[in-house]
């Protein structure tokens, strides 16, 4: 996580060319996301109760930006837990069947729980129920979350229950990400050297 921070964030990786189905270029979109995070979300983190949902295509900067936020908050002394959705489901099953209250309290009470790659986890009634219960507990305790997903809003509403979607889409600030896959772009650039 050391190199995944705002100092190493390169806005020039994002194209200035607007795609016809989007209102802005990928660079303008990312600038807007960065301006919100650096200008509002992080400065007001201690006093506000904003949950974020980053959604968009793979490689568009969601996970990198999530790491940047985590590092910034950890450096300021906040408690942050970063889990992929799949890892989190395994933890929630552990909590349920092993009565692991220590782990449950950590997940519920941390200042920020980051759930990366929602939609990549194995979905069944138990996993969706446990994930819903955790999100609901955190919302009731005014504990913040950041969720990232490659799913569109339409896909989220098709895959998850109405109750789950109501919490996720009704209680989270939605931030859209789009661009060419930056991971591929960086890998191709590095392989040319």
Residue ranges and their predicted role:
Residues 8-52:
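Pre-Walker A (pre-P-loop) alpha-helix and adjacent loop at the N terminus of AAA/AAA+ ATPase modules
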Residues 18-31, 55, 74-109, 122:
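Short glycine-rich substrate-engagement loop in P-loop NTPases that contacts/grips substrate
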Residues 78-79, 109-112, 141-147:
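Loop/turn-to-beta-strand initiation segments
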Residues 44-46, 75, 105-108, 136-141, ...:
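Conserved catalytic network of the ASCE P-loop NTPase/AAA+ motor domain
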Residues 45-66:
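Walker A/P-loop nucleotide-binding motif
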Residues 39-43, 91-113, 128-137:
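Conserved alpha-helical scaffold flanking the Walker A/P-loop in AAA+ ATPase domains
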Residues 64-78:
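P-loop NTPase Walker A phosphate-binding motif
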């Amino acid at each position: 996580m050391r190199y995944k921070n705002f100092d190493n964030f390169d806005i020039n990786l994002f194209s200035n060319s607007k795609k016809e189905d989007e209102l802005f270029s990928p660079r303008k979109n990312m600038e807007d996301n960065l301006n919100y995070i650096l200008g509002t979300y992080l400065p007001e983190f201690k006093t506000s109760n904003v949950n974020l949902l980053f959604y968009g295509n793979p490689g568009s900067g969601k996970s990198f930006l999530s790491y940047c936020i985590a590092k910034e908050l950890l450096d300021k002394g906040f408690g942050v837990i970063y889990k992929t959705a799949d890892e989190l489901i395994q933890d929630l099953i552990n909590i349920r069947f092993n009565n692991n209250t220590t782990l449950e309290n950590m997940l519920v009470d941390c200042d920020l729980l980051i759930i990366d790659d929602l939609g990549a986890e194995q979905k069944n009634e138990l996993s969706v129920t446990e994930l819903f219960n955790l999100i609901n507990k955190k919302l009731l305790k005014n504990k913040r979350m950041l969720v990232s997903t490659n799913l569109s809003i339409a896909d989220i509403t098709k895959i998850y229950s109405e109750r789950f979607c109501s919490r996720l889409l009704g209680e989270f600030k939605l931030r859209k990400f789009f661009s060419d896959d930056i991971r591929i772009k960086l890998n191709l650039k590095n392989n040319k050297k």
